Each structure stands twice: as structure tokens, then as C-alpha cells.
Amino acid sequence: MISSVAPPPEKMLFQLSLRRRGISDRGVLQAMESVPRDRFVDAVHRDSAWRDTALPIACGQTISQPFVVAYMTEQLHLQPGHRVLEIGTGSGYHAAVLSRLVRDVVSVERFKTLADRARARLKELNYANVEVVLGDGFALPEGQGTFDRILVTAAMAELPQPLLDLLDPDGILIAPIGPGNGRQTLIRVQRKDDGFLRKPLVDVRFVPALPGIAREL
């Protein structure tokens, strides 16, 4: 695994910022420190890669603010044997963080350009337990099975039932729910024997999840 090349002061400030904002899970903090965020952004933004801010990537998308990545990851309550589905690969950064904490990650991206770039980047950095799939988050490819955890990284007006059905018993899903052009609520959904238990977490702002596959972008 390639380690970060961030100067030590930047890395220390990065970790301190996460701790000050309430991230306390040691595994999550170690994963956030070990994944080189500067390798997942365009060269023009690399000087800002270790700042706690979202940054633009291709296809009108963004790489999420590090605190949001850490918070969502912490709320998943991950275990080493877990199998995780991510809807919205983007740059591949969040998938890389997840991969340090679980057995396998399947990440679905609707933009071919982003999927191809993320797949190549993750391979180059030796994140071998991440599979990037070009697909539609609203109509997922068949044959992937079910998952211990599901992470949605784009805003949905509501959760599609087929997505919820992919959760294993006691599985957890984290997703931003609300309008694509405003603030959303990050929710935590846990599958129980008698249905799905939903809990609102915090207000967030994500780009909207769009149906279909953008093979030309």
C-alpha cells in the first residue's frame, strides 16, 4: 500500500481536525490517515487535498469533505469481515478508506470516466479488495448478492426498496436523503426482523444521485 506523501504538519492537522469534530474510532482515524487523499484529486487541487473541504472532480462531481467521509464511515460500525456496497464511487477515495476496514468493497459508479479513473487509481495504489462497477445505483447489476453495509454518497429523494433489500439481517445503510439542489439529512437505516429502523443523523449537502449510466462521460 502506498503511504501518504503529505508533509507531517499537514497530516497532523488533518487528524487533529477530525478528532476535534468528534471522530473517535481508532480504525477510522487510521484509515483516514493512511489513504493518500492527494492521489485522488486532480493535480490543480493537490495543495488543498489535506484540507477539510470538498473538492471538484470530473463529470461535475466532488470528492467529499474528509470529515463527512470519516463520519459516514464511523456510523457504519464496520467489522473486518464485512462486505460493503458503495453507491457513487466518484474519485475512489471513500472506497479506499472503506477497504482498509473491511473484507470487500463493491463500488458502483454511473459515470464511465469516473469508474475507469477510480479503477485504475485503486489498482495503482494496490487497493485489491475494491471492485468498481459501472452501473446505475437505482437499478443495480444482478448477481452481486447481499451486503453487511451499504453506503450511498449522493443525495436521493427516497431510498429505493431494491437497495434496502440488499441489506443482510442487522445490516446498516447510510445515505443522504432530500432534494438534490439543497440540504439533505444523513440517515442511518438498520435492517431488523420486523422491518427497517431509521435514524436521522446530521444535515449534509451532496450532489444528487441520477438514474442511468453515463457511458459518454
Curated annotation (Swiss-Prot):
Keyword list, A-Z: Cytoplasm, Methyltransferase, S-adenosyl-L-methionine, Transferase
Record-annotated active site: 64
Disulfide bonds: none
Molecular function via GO: protein-L-isoaspartate (D-aspartate) O-methyltransferase activity
Localisation per UniProt entry: Cytoplasm
EC number(s) from the headed UniProt entry: 2.1.1.77
Membrane-crossing residue ranges in chain numbering: none
Protein family (similarity comment): Belongs to the methyltransferase superfamily. L-isoaspartyl/D-aspartyl protein methyltransferase family.
Official protein name in the record: Protein-L-isoaspartate O-methyltransferase 2
Organism for this UniProt entry: Rhodopseudomonas palustris (strain HaA2)
Gene encoding the protein: pcm2
